Amino acid sequence: MLHGPKKHSHLSNTMGSRLLIRPYFPPRNLCHSQDATTLLRELQDAFDSYNQSFRGEIMRFQKAFAERVLNMVEARYPVNQLKINAEILTRKVCYHSPAHDPLDLALERQQYLFIYVSCEKIQELLFNRRFLVGTEAAVATSIQPYRSELSRGEMARVHNLAWRRRQTKESDMDCFVAIFSSTLFVSWYEARAVDIYGDEVLCPFLIRQATGDRDYDVVAYGFTKFAENATSRRLPARASSFLDLKLGPPVSATDDEAADGEPTLGPGETRTSA
């Protein structure tokens, strides 16, 4: 999920050294957030920082890129596809290098998503500087990492219900990567988790199919605040309601014409919640 073999699209190869250097958004390191409330507020600040300052920088880059592409004299493929993409890039933020196809674009209704990974995967993220999607699908949820009423074991269980092609362990719930949803994500599965108080919590999952080797902007990363799995200990008092980081319902495959369809179900797989 965080890395894959190096592959380059035909569009990327076409531009070659003529590509402009895309601005880099340094993901916010939230590993030192001491509690769930602090993590919530620091996450909100990180998303606000991307929206308020970096989006303008990205659009300036994309318009310069588009101008360069549209001035190219070649008309054959893949240059003609680059020109089609360039027109789109003058209007919508793209979360990765614009030389890749299909484009993964910002949604009109923003939604914050979280991809849960092990500490080892976070180290790879720090090394790569960006979230690299290669040969595996990216499995994300709108369930936030500060949800301390949910246990690591229960979160691993519902991840395995949502995506049975990869075995998720409790250690994969130790860390999170915060990103924006985008046009290549499709609404996939809604699981029912049970929190440490015995209450049911709906967990929506979204899938972005493997797209070849491309890197994506990461807004923030850090340690989750999910509960330990021991049930014999005395339960903590239920936390007061958190601010909701979700800015809209999960995107469906029909929300944007740029979404490229649902992943294919494997044998015995179902999207009906257990």
UniProtKB/Swiss-Prot annotation:
Q: Which stretches are transmembrane? A: none
- InterPro entries tied to this protein: Glycosidase
Keyword presence, Cell membrane: no
The record's keywords, sorted A to Z, are:
Plasmid
> Pfam family example for this protein?
RolB_RolC
Query: Which parts of this chain are annotated as the region Disordered?
Result: 248-274
So what family is this one in? Belongs to the rolB/rolC family.
The record's function comment reads: Contributes to the root inducing activity.
Q: What is this protein called?
A: Protein RolB(TR)
**Which organism is the protein's source?**
Rhizobium rhizogenes
**Gene that produces this protein:** rolB
